Amino acid sequence: MSRFQRLTKYVAIGGGAALLLAGAAYLAGAKVNTTKSIPVGLYWKSNAPVEKGAYVMFCPPQVGVFSDAKERGYIAGGFCPGDYGYMMKRVLAAKGDEVAITDAGVRVNGGLLPHSALIKADPSGRPLPRYQSDSYTLGTAEVLLMSDVSDTSFDGRYFGPVNRSQIITVIRPVLTW
């Protein structure tokens, strides 16, 4: 067997093993985030309760704002109903919290959230949706899903509260950068 054939054989075996390992990790609960909405990195599915501060993975509801977002490329296609890809965000408000969404940003119980000022247009100049709420108290089944690390995330400031039933799982960071 030539040197090239041996090298090809080892690369193929190594590549196959890496694919099997990645598939097993995914099935066991590993999730990779490559967006700016939460810190980039490796996350693990958790049975923890959905509460303020938790990172979650959710399926967008089948409503117009998400259809437009998918059409514009803000969210990907995937395996959620409506052919949406799942999204990862942080729960920054929950039951009983007072939420106000204005041009200045999102306030929860009077405090302005970082990175929450509304951006009027996307990089292509298209107007972004606007969820306007001067004051709204979240109900039992509602959460506000936001980014607390990115000014440009497509999050609750544009689509408003989400029903807890849309949440697939809580995710915990394993390795982020």
UniProtKB/Swiss-Prot annotation:
Domain of life: Bacteria
Gene Ontology terms describing biological process: signal peptide processing
Range of residues in the leader sequence: 1-30
GO molecular function: serine-type endopeptidase activity
Keywords assigned: Conjugation, Periplasm, Plasmid, Signal
Transmembrane segments: none
Subcellular location(s) per record: Periplasm
Recorded GO CC terms: periplasmic space
Function field: Required for donor-specific phage sensitivity. May be involved in pilus assembly.
Family: Belongs to the peptidase S26C family.
Name assigned to this protein: Plasmid transfer protein TraF
Originating organism: Escherichia coli
Gene: traF
